[in-house]
């Protein structure tokens, strides 16, 4: 990350203080905001500086030297580095706790659970959606109030050293890793690469005297926390998840003392992150009754662990993303429910590199051996299907062919798990189910 000259950093901080936030998108409402002209593969924000100012932006940041001397424009040597450096400088003014959160699965859902629990006692600013990369994290920080009460920063990565960069920008005082599994294997360079990449969050805490919330149910997370002096255990083994399909609340969570509370959230694989929200809330003074109320009120969205009654079928929609770990969690949990007519509609998993063929074969066999009627779509599942002719498995090379088959069958009275990578877009199947 680049270091801005002090006078340039001061100018940018002054511009941020005079604005209502920061944006990189001229399609958004820019009134009162600061605009960063980023350059990407398919766009160049430098071409929209005038448009941003005309749209009400208070200030613009660009690399285009023709704007030198304009009172509402700052010219920088490199726009992304300037965005990241400004975000770190802005964050360094705060005295509040900053919680960094990463993991192979469940980051966004966990962030929302933690946010909602903390918000019962704190003025919380948290990552919007999944703005969790080298651009999203700086924007998360820069769109926080000048003096927030608590900040929760989601951090995503598909290569080593990316979490380290995000931690350098956000400088978390606390951290939580949901789990360390088989995600983005291609970019991370295999399973060990995933471990090293996720561990970077705890490495930052170890170096800077931070506190790690340690998920005891994941051996790799426990190992990754070894160098952190201040650790708080997240004791998931003492809690229980009871599923109740067809009810308003899809699950009941049993506390160690035997008391239960309802949740709308689907999937027992979410239990560790529910417990994390409780433990983190308790650490920061959230009374149990407020934490419980926040968790019971939480309703998942954006195709993550959502139970949907279509009128014809009961659908567990978990189609936001997929990797071998999350797929295995979902299939095992769904099969354990002992549904009367269980289907699984699964789409290809992306970014697995050399592990792709084996991962799809294993996942298909897991679903079939569990007694699920399996429908799959995508190239990798197609290769796996060529080696397995079980009649309970139907495969389609393309999404349109899958839709045609569903239209012909018109399933009714089924319980259906729908899961695949973001690129598969399987949430589009709901009208046909």
Q: Whereabouts are the PLM-identified features?
A:
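N-terminal leader/targeting and accessory segments in enzymes
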Residues: 1-85, 89, 266, 335-340, ...
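Acidic, Mg2+-coordinating active-site environments of NTP-dependent enzymes
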Residues: 62-63, 67-70, 176-314, 339-340, ...
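Phosphate-binding loop of NTP-binding sites
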Residues: 82-212, 216, 220-228, 432
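ATP-dependent carboxylate/acyl-activation modules
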Residues: 101, 302-304, 423, 427-429
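Short amphipathic alpha-helix with an adjacent loop that forms part of the alpha/beta core around
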Residues: 168, 401-410
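Glycine-rich phosphate/pyrophosphate-binding beta-alpha loops
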Residues: 301-303, 319-329
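Peripheral docking tails and interdomain loops at the edges
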Residues: 395, 414-431
């Amino acid at each position: 990350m680049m270091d801005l000259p002090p006078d340039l950093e001061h100018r940018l901080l002054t511009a941020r203080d005079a604005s209502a936030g920061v944006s990189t998108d001229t399609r958004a409402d820019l009134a009162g905001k600061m605009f960063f002209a980023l350059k990407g593969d398919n766009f160049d924000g430098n071409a929209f500086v005038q448009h941003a100012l005309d749209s009400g932006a208070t200030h613009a940041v660009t690399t285009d030297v023709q704007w030198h001397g304009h009172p509402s424009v700052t010219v920088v040597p490199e726009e992304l580095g300037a965005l990241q450096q400004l975000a770190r400088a802005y964050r360094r003014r705060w005295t509040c706790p900053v919680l960094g959160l990463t993991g192979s699965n469940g980051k966004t859902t966990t962030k929302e659970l933690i946010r909602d629990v903390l918000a019962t006692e704190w003025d919380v600013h948290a990552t919007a959606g999944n703005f969790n990369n080298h651009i999203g994290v700086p924007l998360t920080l820069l769109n926080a109030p000048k003096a927030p009460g608590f900040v929760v920063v989601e951090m995503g990565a598909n290569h080593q050293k990316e979490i380290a960069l995000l931690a350098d920008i956000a400088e978390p005082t606390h951290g939580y890793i949901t789990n360390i599994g088989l995600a983005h294997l291609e970019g991370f360079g295999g399973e060990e690469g995933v471990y090293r990449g996720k561990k970077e969050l705890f490495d930052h805490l170890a170096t800077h005297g931070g506190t790690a919330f340690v998920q005891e149910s994941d051996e790799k997370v426990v190992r990754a926390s070894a160098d952190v002096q201040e650790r708080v255990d997240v004791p998931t083994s003492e809690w229980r998840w009871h599923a109740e399909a067809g009810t308003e609340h899809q699950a009941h969570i049993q506390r160690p003392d035997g008391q239960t509370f309802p949740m709308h959230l689907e999937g027992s694989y979410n239990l560790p992150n529910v417990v994390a929200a409780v433990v983190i809330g308790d650490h920061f003074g959230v009374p149990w009754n407020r934490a419980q109320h926040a968790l019971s009120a939480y309703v998942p969205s954006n195709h993550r662990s959502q139970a949907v009654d279509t009128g014809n079928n009961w659908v567990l929609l978990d189609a936001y993303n997929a990797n071998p770990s999350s797929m295995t969690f979902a299939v095992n949990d769904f099969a354990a429910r002992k549904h009367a007519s269980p289907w699984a509609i699964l789409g290809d998993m992306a970014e697995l590199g050399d592990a792709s063929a084996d991962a799809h074969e294993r996942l298909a066999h897991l679903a079939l051996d569990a007694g699920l009627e399996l429908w799959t779509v995508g190239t990798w599942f197609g290769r796996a299907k060529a080696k397995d002719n079980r009649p309970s498995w139907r495969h389609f090379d393309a999404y349109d062919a899958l839709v045609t088959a569903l239209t012909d069958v018109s399933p009714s009275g089924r319980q259906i798990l729908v899961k695949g990578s973001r690129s598969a877009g399987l949430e589009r199947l709901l009208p046909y189910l």
